[in-house]
């Protein structure tokens, strides 16, 4: 066999091996933790005992209840304390580390309760307050039917200073003011809409103190599109007292509507994106997870953090389908997006009902 023939054969064999390597991906080695669970990075093993502890002792056995709602709120109130011009460390845990300062900010009214609930877990486990806040929020959302696995990165350093005041948007702020504040932190108008999917599993305690634990939609224990549907219905009543700052009329007894949500659902800058979330569970899940991950990294250097996203549990499947509440029809929708028709939805059977408060509020 000539040298030229041998060379051609070697090249052919090399190409075949290269093709085979490309066709059969290498199996990624996973770390086995002390309790037998596995993760992509051994540094993430420290999270499994924390996961078990908060599921049992903070979230009442992995429920999607009041503590989940408040933990998710805390992720935002800590992280949005960030401005390139005004300062703030972002998602650094300052709202826990400097709680005597930040919980007294007017926009953080009522958040002292979840801060007090989380502080013992931070003290007990080897984790920074910034990491714990974002980890607890991600785990909490995963408890909700229809929820998402929000990416989680470990390794935030301890906060060195309190956030400045006036960085958290208020429910009585104008749309332009809210969008300007969020733009300052790096978020576009559509990303603001995506973040507000959090209100699908949220409630208000302080907007109307006479009715604590009043949810923003009729399914506060399910991560779904009902919030985006029901905020577009005509307001009929105040579920408690009237004339509360930051409150608009709600369509249902037992459901509260923030003035900011009412306006964002109808503003030309956000109305079409708002409507696009109706009955679009994959979009809600994908956009919310991506934007929450972005928010959780405000003020942080991602290259210095460890991706521990695989520790976050897989959420239960969505329960139920998008619908109009009983007693409503499409004529009750105050459609603000002229570009596309409002999705065709049917109403639940029966008369108009009342939404119960979130248990444990």
From Swiss-Prot:
Binding site residues for heme b:
199, 203-207
Site positions per UniProt: Transition state stabilizer: 73
Q: What is the lineage of its organism?
A: Eukaryota, Fungi, Dikarya, Basidiomycota, Agaricomycotina
Q: Cofactor note from UniProt?
A: Binds 1 heme b (iron(II)-protoporphyrin IX) group per subunit.
Name listed for the protein in its UniProt record:
Versatile peroxidase VPL1
Q: What class of enzyme is it?
A: oxidoreductase
Q: Which UniProt keywords apply?
A: Calcium, Disulfide bond, Glycoprotein, Heme, Hydrogen peroxide, Iron, Lignin degradation, Manganese, Metal-binding, Organic radical, Oxidoreductase, Peroxidase, Secreted, Signal, Zymogen
CC terms in the record's Gene Ontology section: extracellular region
Q: What does this protein do?
A: A versatile ligninolytic peroxidase that combines the substrate specificity characteristics of the two other ligninolytic peroxidases, manganese peroxidase and lignin peroxidase.
Reactions this protein catalyses: 1-(4-hydroxy-3-methoxyphenyl)-2-(2-methoxyphenoxy)propane-1,3-diol + H2O2 = guaiacol + vanillin + glycolaldehyde + H2O; 2 Mn(2+) + H2O2 + 2 H(+) = 2 Mn(3+) + 2 H2O
PANTHER family with a match to the protein in the record: CATALASE-PEROXIDASE (PTHR31356:SF66), THYLAKOID LUMENAL 29 KDA PROTEIN, CHLOROPLASTIC-RELATED (PTHR31356)
Q: Which GO terms describe its biological process?
A: cellular response to oxidative stress; hydrogen peroxide catabolic process; lignin catabolic process; response to reactive oxygen species
Chain ranges passing through the membrane? none
Q: Which residues bind Ca(2+) 2?
A: 200, 217, 219, 222, 224
Does the entry annotate any disulfide bonds, and if so which pairs?
33-45, 44-308, 64-144, 272-337
Q: Give the active-site positions.
A: 77 (proton acceptor), 194 (tryptophan radical intermediate)
Q: Which cofactor does it need?
A: heme b; Ca(2+)
State the compartments where it is located. Answer: Secreted
Sorted alphabetically, which Pfam families does this protein's record hold?
peroxidase, Peroxidase_ext
Residue span of the signal peptide, if any? 1-22
One GO molecular-function annotation for this sequence? reactive-black-5:hydrogen-peroxide oxidoreductase activity
Q: Which family does it belong to?
A: Belongs to the peroxidase family. Ligninase subfamily.
Which parts of this protein are propeptide? 23-30
Q: What is its EC number?
A: 1.11.1.16
């Amino acid at each position: 066999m000539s040298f030229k023939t041998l060379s051609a054969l070697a090249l052919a064999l090399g190409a075949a091996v290269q093709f085979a390597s490309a066709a059969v991906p290498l199996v990624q080695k996973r770390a086995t933790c002390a309790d037998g669970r596995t993760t992509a990075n051994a540094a993430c093993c420290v999270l499994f005992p924390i996961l078990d502890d908060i599921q049992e002792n903070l979230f009442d056995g992995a429920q999607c209840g009041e503590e989940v709602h408040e933990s998710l709120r805390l992720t935002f109130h800590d992280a949005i304390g960030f401005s390139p011009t005004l300062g703030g460390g972002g998602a650094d845990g300052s709202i826990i580390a400097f709680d005597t300062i930040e919980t007294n900010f007017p926009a953080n009214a009522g958040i002292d309760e979840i801060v007090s609930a989380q502080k013992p877990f931070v003290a007990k486990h080897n984790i920074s307050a910034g990491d714990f806040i974002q980890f607890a929020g991600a785990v909490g959302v995963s408890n909700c039917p229809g929820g998402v696995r929000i990416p989680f990165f470990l390794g935030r350093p301890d906060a060195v200073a309190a956030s400045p005041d006036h960085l958290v948007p208020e429910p009585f702020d104008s749309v332009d003011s809210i969008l300007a504040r969020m733009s300052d932190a790096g978020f576009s108008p559509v990303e603001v809409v995506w973040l507000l999917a959090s209100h699908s599993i949220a409630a208000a305690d302080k907007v109307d103190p006479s009715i604590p634990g009043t949810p923003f939609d009729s399914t506060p224990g399910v991560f779904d599109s009902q919030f985006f549907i029901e905020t577009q219905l005509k307001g009929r009543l105040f579920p408690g007292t009237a004339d509360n700052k930051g409150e608009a009329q709600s369509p249902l007894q037992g459901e509260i509507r923030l003035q900011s949500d009412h306006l964002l659902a109808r503003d030309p800058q956000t109305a079409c994106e708002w409507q696009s979330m109706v009955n679009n569970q994959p979009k809600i899940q994908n956009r919310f997870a991506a934007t929450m991950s972005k928010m959780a990294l405000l003020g942080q250097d991602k290259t210095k953090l460890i991706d521990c996203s695989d520790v976050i549990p897989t959420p239960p499947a969505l329960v139920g389908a998008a619908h109009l509440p009983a007693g409503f029809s499409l004529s009750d929708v105050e459609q603000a997006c002229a570009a596309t028709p409002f999705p065709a939805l049917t109403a639940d059977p029966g008369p108009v009902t009342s939404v119960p408060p979130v248990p444990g509020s």
